Amino acid sequence: MLGLLKKVVGDPSQRQLKKNQKIADQVEALSDEMKSLSDDGLRQKTEEFKKRYKNGESLDDLLPEAYAVVREAATRVLNMTPYPVQILGAIALHQGNIAEMKTGEGKTLVGTMPVYLNALAGKGVHVVTVNDYLARRDSEQMGAMFEFLGLTVGLNVPGLSKEEKKEAYQADITYGTNNEFGFDYLRDNMVLYKEQMVQRSLNFALVDEVDSILIDEARTPLIISGSVERSTKLYSQANSFVRVLKNEEDYTLDEKTKSVQLTEEGVNKAERAFNIDNLFDQRHVQLLHHINQAMKAHVVMHRDADYVVENGEIVIVDQFTGRLMKGRRYSDGLHQAIEAKEGLQIQRESMTLASITFQNYFRMYQKLAGMTGTAKTEEEEFRNIYGMDVMVIPTNKPVIRDDRPDLIFKTMDAKFKAVVNEIEELYKKGQPVLVGTVSVETSELVSTLLKKRRIPHHVLNAKNHEKEAEIIENAGHRGAVTIATNMAGRGTDIKLGEGVRELGGLHVLGTERHESRRIDNQLRGRSGRQGDPGSSQFYLSMEDELMRRFGSDNMRAMMDKLGMEEDQPIESKLVSRAVETAQKRVEGNNFDARKQILQYDDVMREQREIIYKQRMEVLESDNLREIVEKMILSVIERNVQLHTPESEVPEDWDYGAIVNFMKANLLNEDDLTEKDIWGKDPEEIVEIIYDKVIERYNKKEEEFTPEHMREFEKVIMLRTVDRKWMNHIDQMDQLRQGIHLRAYGQNDPLREYRFEGFEMFEAMVASIEEEVAMYVMKAQVQQNLQREKVAEGQAVQPKPTDGDSKAKRQPVRKKETVGRNEPCPCGSGKKYKNCCGQ
């Protein structure tokens, strides 16, 4: 249908290409003018462009001249002059599109033009590559040209200090990997001081190998995780303390809200038991939290009603169905508190402190562009999800590679025997061969078979990027045999050695069709670069996964009918077309899966953006008092509303519960009595309580000075938001894991996830307000306030995917360690080495 439509109305990307051709002609027309300039004259053009941009000229206006300047600078510094087709590619990139350019057509050089142009705006440009080696290589090679033109270049790789990272991001152009850019965004939203942030706002990103990052890796979440509860001791201690408390005397239970609160006597007992002066002090946040959870475990949660003990583990009981919910855990430390209550082993939990998928990270840039050799097959996905069109840029010289039809064998053994025979024949002839495999196992199998025949070869499975580039560079030399998984060696060209052209160039031999046509096209594209000779062919068997899944029975029956031998292949265009149809079907399924995941991720994205925006406001604000007062008012209104329902007569309202709550959270023991609020309507009750709380707030501020109070509010706000947000991420993860089961009850899982996720978010916001209000009113203000991280994040760099499509994508995790002399993340106030680090 799409093909027919294009025939009638024409391909829009081709129409755009024609428009861009006119701009490219303007760039070329300026060539002589730029050649006549001295090096200094060329460099001064950068300052001239910056001034013109500030005076109102758009980047589009500057494009022809700017590209002509880069073209001339590339000739002088890199000894490379971009071809007319490369200028076309560069124009498509500036327009926020994807330039599909065949291997060897100089994508890296093409990228320099839009990068230079967009850097003139002074808002920063990120050049994103798939690995550190390519980022380093490109920043050095292309960086020399940018520096010649007076722009600064930064390199963002793992292991840099905050200062080094900040410097890299302050540069006009920053090179780095997708993982590192994503992790820095997450870490910036966990800082305690605005000065600790390293990234600027996300302006323009140019993504190299865009299909790999935005499609293959799209579902991979970047996760910063940390062990929040480093010690399980506090759970046991809180449990022992709570066991001896008496109802009404030491704590009160609100039946409606199922919340438990310590009375004044209970607080005194806790301070004596733990030998501390003030339970509400900032240093004892963790202790108070553990006591509250232990009380909830003992008073609110009942064995065999809310949970059961099975095989030494706490299993939650679903309150609606009565079914056991294995694998689910209560959040916020309640699960560990119940484990302590029941005398079971207390599990340490690693929590997600922050996470984001590449899809959502890259969609935050003002403008996004990408380059790859293969994107047209995924055009619909790029357009729907990222709003980017794919422009197929013509090659500088026609491709003369001979793409032969697939060879199909009955069995895998017969296929591999034929593969090795072919390699041996080509090796004897001296023609270089690149053997493409779908998985590491296959590459090792082919390697073993070649060793038996004593054929020297190199195996590449993306374990060493530096060595990988060297092997790939030599893969076009006479007699070279290279086995590579599909992803290995992307971004490095295979140049033909001496005398290889006469032998037919590089031969690419695929041992299996990938479920994505794009990956097969990438493998083919390794040969026949820039008009070089070359050939490619895929060897398949009826036992390959793709063939097994899609209609190989008919073909096998046909082979049997023809009485074909095991090692006798079918070579047929018809078969190749059938395989391609199967691939299209798989690609469609994968696209649907990614789209669905994105819909779920969007729920979390909206929530994350709200929290991060508010967190930023807290960091930037000098006075949070107004926000805290609003939070206090919300807390009072909610509690009063709960205990003064319209459905009851005022005589039945629970005034006692209101007074107990206010004493426990906002006021002193003598500040409020039931008599003060008896007979008043809810609005009056709220007003009376609010006035009393603000009076206490003012006294506190006089006592500790406004300056200390402002920092104190900030410390409490950041700590509370971070801890509650972490728990919320955890709860949302748990909700998502079980949500698909709702489909059995004729409910739409996505709608349910949105609805429940929103309810959970609202509950989290209410919980943040309650905790901030309580600590501001109850905690002592310390003179030497320190903002402390709620938990130490941890990061693990992802392992290369090796092109193994069968390997399940693992989340990318980042871990960060605690210094021995730093404050312990558990919140005890001691140094790490004297506390949890013993």
UniProtKB/Swiss-Prot annotation:
Zn(2+) binds at C824, C826, C835, C836. It is found in: Cell membrane; Cytoplasm. Its cofactor is Zn(2+). GO terms for cellular component: cell envelope Sec protein transport complex; cytosol; plasma membrane. Residues 517-536, 789-838 are annotated as: Disordered. Keywords: ATP-binding, Cell membrane, Cytoplasm, Membrane, Metal-binding, Nucleotide-binding, Protein transport, Translocase, Translocation, Transport, Zinc. The keyword Oxidoreductase does not apply. Residues 801-819 have a biased composition (Basic and acidic residues). Its EC number is 7.4.2.8. May bind 1 zinc ion per subunit. It is a peripheral membrane protein. ATP binds at Q86, G104, E105, G106, K107, T108, D493. PROSITE patterns: SECA, SECA_MOTOR_DEAD. It comes from the Bacteria. It catalyses: ATP + H2O + cellular proteinSide 1 = ADP + phosphate + cellular proteinSide 2. One of its GO terms (molecular function) is protein-exporting ATPase activity. Part of the Sec protein translocase complex. Interacts with the SecYEG preprotein conducting channel. Has a central role in coupling the hydrolysis of ATP to the transfer of proteins into and across the cell membrane, serving as an ATP-driven molecular motor driving the stepwise translocation of polypeptide chains across the membrane. Belongs to the SecA family. This is Protein translocase subunit SecA.
